[in-house]
Regions:
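A short hydrophobic beta-strand element
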Residues: 106-115
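Short, surface-exposed coil-to-beta transition loops
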Residues: 96-97, 125-131
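A solvent-exposed, acidic/Ser-Thr-rich amphipathic alpha-helical stretch
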Residues: 54-100
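Short beta-strand edge/turn micro-motifs at domain boundaries
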Residues: 128-154
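Short, cysteine-centered beta-strand-loop-beta hairpins and adjacent loop/turn segments enriched
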Residues: 91, 117-126
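Short, low-complexity N-terminal intrinsically disordered segments enriched in polar/charged residues
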Residues: 18-54, 58, 78
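Hydrophobic pocket/interface hotspot
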Residues: 40, 52-53, 60, 77, ...
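Bacterial Sec-dependent N-terminal signal peptides
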Residues: 1-24
Length: 156
């Protein structure tokens, strides 16, 4: 009897292990999560452009909150987006996003935040804003940024 029980347990365990190794990712593994958005925000606060880009698709799009067209300045592809983010950190060496809150609906997500930073001329900025995200296969395909239009606070 022990041999029969052992035999069936071995089959069940082997079957379970084999199923795990060949089962494709579940749908939820490719969906946006609060953890992904938190990590993305943390990478921004660390000024870690490589880490930021690791959360984005190769053909990602960043629509900046300001620019010459109706949807701000648009950066397409990782190289262009990388340069745009590097410029933000160059122009605001102490850039920081706080009071971050996230919301998710399907493949879309929103992050609200307060941005603070000091420009190279010493003037300061503090504004609220949000990012609208479109995800594809668990990564950010579009980051569309909006923020309040408030003049910089002059250097004191």
């Amino acid at each position: 009897m022990k041999k029969i029980i052992f035999f069936f347990l071995t089959i069940l365990i082997t079957d379970k292990l084999m199923a795990q190794s060949i089962t494709p990712k579940t749908a939820t593994e490719n969906k946006p999560t609060i953890a992904i958005l938190d990590s993305f925000a943390n990478a921004f606060n660390a000024h870690d452009v490589g880490k930021i880009l690791s959360y984005m698709t190769d053909d990602c799009v960043f629509e900046a909150s300001a620019g010459p067209s109706v949807d701000g300045e648009k950066f397409i592809g990782k190289e262009a987006v990388k340069k745009a983010f590097e410029d933000v950190f160059k122009n605001y060496p102490n850039a920081h996003w706080s009071n971050v809150r996230h919301f998710i609906s399907g493949e879309r997500a929103v992050s609200e935040w307060t941005f603070t930073g000091t420009k190279l001329d010493g003037s300061k900025i503090e504004v609220t804003g949000c990012d609208l995200f479109t995800f594809r296969d668990g990564k950010i395909a579009i980051k569309n940024s909006y923020r309040k239009n408030r003049p910089p606070i002059p250097k004191s």
